[in-house]
């Protein structure tokens, strides 16, 4: 193949600004293929309550504010830039929803589908002009409802390819996708035991063309255990960071099964995310002692920053991996 440039991003968590930057990224980085490696949606919906007199009540990052009509659009943009969603509603609607857990969940599912659909439509409008492909999958923080939405949205698309627990091809490359994670303290929607990860990933690799592992990118949301890209703060029983000498104590939180399977199958590259603060590139030795590169682009979605990893590939393999931030 001719020299190819691929942009890898992950963990955008619904950030309106990060998605906007992603829509422009292929022109900036001169690439015709993008991988979005999971955690697509936001964390919560922030209600903006109409007081009935052209003012609104809203709690922004813990601070209650009363805003005017002419401040509404800017407030929505500020909130959604950092990965939260917004919903403007009347006092009556807010009272009804806030006292009913089912209605809260229904609202969140409705809003996250609408917002993700809007972000993907913005991307499609730009990528389709230059025939750029985006390989996408949900992560552990995305609901199974979003997993189904992504499958439906991408079905028949010329721009998007859903790779969650699937195999796709791009020219001579083979991509495997797996968006679940191991168990976390946060009890997120798509977590599995190590045994289940091992079983399902083995099944996925077994379905692939194993003679093409030297041209295979394994897109696995959770990083492999005991690497430079799986370090997160150690937490106490009440989920507070452990501090020693004024610094947070870091520990490996990646998947042992993912590491074992990379050692076993030896793909060309492992692409990961999940641990926002562990951007970087590391190497795992397979069973023949060959080094397999694994990367995590990291995430600063809450600041509207798009972090990435720009890959340069040629017939001989990976020429360069450059971490990006913009």
What annotation goes with each model-predicted range?
Residues 11, 19, 34, 39, ...:
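Divalent metal-coordination and catalytic microenvironments
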Residues 14, 166-171, 192, 264, ...:
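Binuclear metal-dependent phosphoesterase catalytic core
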Residues 16, 20, 29, 242, ...:
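Catalytic phosphate/metal-binding cores of nucleic-acid and nucleotide-processing enzymes, i.e., regions
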Residues 171-216, 237, 244-256:
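Binuclear metal-dependent hydrolase catalytic cores centered on His/Asp/Glu-rich metal-binding motifs
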């Amino acid at each position: 193949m001719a020299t190819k440039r691929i942009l890898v991003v992950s963990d955008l968590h619904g950030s309106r600004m990060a998605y906007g930057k992603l829509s422009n990224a292929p022109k900036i980085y001169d690439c015709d293929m993008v991988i979005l490696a999971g955690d697509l949606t936001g964390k919560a919906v922030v209600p903006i309550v109409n007081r009935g007199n052209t003012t609104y009540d809203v709690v922004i990052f813990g601070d209650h504010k009363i805003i005017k009509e002419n401040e509404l659009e800017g407030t929505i943009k500020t909130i959604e830039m950092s990965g939260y969603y917004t919903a403007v509603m009347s006092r009556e609607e807010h009272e009804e929803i806030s006292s009913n857990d089912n209605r809260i969940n229904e609202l969140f599912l409705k809003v996250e589908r609408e917002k993700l659909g809007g972000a993907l439509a913005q991307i499609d409008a730009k990528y389709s002009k230059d025939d750029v492909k985006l390989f996408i999958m949900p992560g552990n923080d995305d609901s199974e409802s979003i997993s189904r939405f992504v499958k439906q949205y991408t079905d028949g698309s010329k721009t998007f390819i859903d790779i969650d627990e699937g195999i796709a091809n791009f020219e001579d490359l083979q991509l495997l996708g797996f968006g679940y994670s191991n168990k976390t303290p946060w009890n997120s929607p798509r977590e599995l035991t190590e045994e289940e990860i091992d079983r399902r990933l083995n099944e996925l690799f077994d379905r692939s063309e194993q003679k093409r592992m030297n041209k295979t990118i394994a897109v696995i949301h959770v990083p492999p255990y005991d690497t430079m890209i799986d370090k997160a703060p150690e937490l106490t029983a009440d989920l507070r960071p452990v501090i020693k000498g004024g610094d947070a104590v870091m520990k490996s939180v990646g998947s042992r099964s993912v590491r074992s399977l990379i050692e076993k199958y030896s793909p060309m590259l492992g692409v990961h995310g999940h641990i926002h603060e562990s951007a970087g590139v590391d190497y795992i030795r397979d069973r023949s002692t060959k080094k397999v590169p694994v990367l995590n682009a990291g995430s600063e979605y809450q600041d509207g920053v798009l972090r990435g990893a720009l890959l340069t590939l040629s017939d001989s393999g990976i020429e360069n991996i450059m971490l990006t931030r913009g």
